[in-house]
A protein has these predicted regions:
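Conserved beta-strand segments of alpha/beta enzyme cores
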Residues: 65, 184-185, 230
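Short glycine/threonine-rich catalytic loop with a Thr-x-Gly-x-Asp
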Residues: 46, 96-97, 217
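Short loop/edge segments at beta-strand edges and connector loops
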Residues: 68-70, 190, 235
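N-terminal subdomain of lithium-sensitive/metallo-dependent phosphomonoesterases centered on the IMPase/IPPase/PAP
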Residues: 1-90, 176-179, 266, 277-302, ...
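DPxDG-like acidic metal-binding loop motif
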Residues: 78-140, 146, 305-310
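Residue-level signal for inorganic ion chemistry
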Residues: 21, 46, 57, 93, ...
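Phosphate/pyrophosphate- and phosphate-bearing ligand-binding catalytic cores of soluble enzymes
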Residues: 148-220
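Oxyanion/phosphate-interacting regions
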Residues: 1-18, 178-180, 194-292
Length: 311
């Protein structure tokens, strides 16, 4: 589906999107901002980059449905095919409006509800991140495909955790989570660049307790996974795509690790871990009294089926 030749052409398309976005960024005037029905900002850059991206991907992949932030509305009839594209022409529109360089162009190809290819381009630096052949890559400005460098997550040191988040979306739940895990550093970064920093091994966790849309994170998810990390829900299951209204709930993006401490996920739900652990131990004790056992499901953080342990 994604061949080397297709990657080269997608990168060329991303560079065209970068040029368009940067052109508008340099001459941007806040008076030109419009607002959508949900009160989110819309700029000329959003519209024009979207047109370039959609036209380019339709030309390369004529039979694959494209879901774009700027084309989607609640009445959209999603075909939920085997493959579909998720596009965010300007991820971090607030950063763009406030003249911050941290906005991106995002493309993601989804297969069976999981992202298999992602590309994130940062117009202000010309940097492009993408994944291909189960590896994550970084391409600096004015370089061609052959100059791409492999990037990888670093193993998480739980005694020296490094986190990042967007201070524009800082909730009480997120503040509580940060106080609980006690990172040695917490960077404020907008847009999907957060996933790129994770993929490069610069940080360990990106927690999110406020809503996002699938096109916000799918490209970063794909790149991060190829770099050795992942994006999971508060139940410990990998985030899926093609959900109702393309809306994400709470998630935790992480670097390379064998296991995420389940107390991190419990706290992400804003639950008291001590009370949760106490209730869990009491439930286990009651199960043992009745000679019952629990069969785990896909997630180890929830109960599955209950049956007798008697032979």
């Amino acid at each position: 589906m994604i061949t080397k030749n297709k990657i080269v052409k997608i990168i060329e398309l991303a560079k065209k999107c970068n040029e368009c976005a940067l052109h508008h960024f340099k001459k941007f005037d806040k008076k030109s901002v419009n607002y959508k029905d949900d009160n989110s900002p819309l700029t000329k850059a959003d519209v024009e980059v979207n047109n370039i991206a959609v036209y380019g991907l339709q030309k390369l992949f004529p039979n694959i449905e494209i879901i774009s932030e700027e084309l989607y509305n609640s009445k959209h009839i999603f075909k939920n095919n085997k493959y579909f594209w998720l596009i965010d022409p300007i991820d971090g529109t607030k950063e763009f409006i406030n003249k911050s360089p941290n906005f991106t162009v995002n493309f993601a190809l989804v297969k069976h509800n999981l992202p298999i290819f992602g590309l994130i381009a940062q117009p202000t630096t010309g940097t492009i991140w993408y994944n291909f052949n189960n590896k994550a890559w970084k391409l600096d400005k004015d370089q061609d495909f052959k100059s791409s460098q492999i990037i990888q997550c670093k193993g998480i040191n739980y005694k020296k955790l490094r986190t990042l988040s967007s201070f524009n979306h800082r909730s009480k739940e997120l503040e509580d989570w940060m106080s609980f895990v006690k990172p040695i550093s917490d960077q404020d970064i907008g847009s999907s660049i957060k996933f790129c920093y994770l993929a490069e091994g610069k940080v360990d966790f990106y927690p999110r307790t406020s809503p996002t849309m699938e096109w916000d994170i799918a490209a970063g998810h794909s790149i991060l996974k190829s770099a050795g990390g992942n994006v999971i829900s508060d139940s410990g299951i990998e985030i899926k795509y093609g959900k109702m209204k393309f809306l994400n709930d709470i998630f935790l993006a992480h670097g390379k690790t064998k296991n995420i401490p389940h107390k991190f996920l419990i706290k992400l739900k804003n639950k008291n871990f001590d009370n949760y652990d106490k209730d869990l131990q009491e439930s286990i004790s009651e199960l043992k009294k009745e000679n019952l056992v629990v069969f785990p499901t896909e997630t180890v953080y929830g109960l599955g089926a209950i049956g007798s342990s008697k032979k």
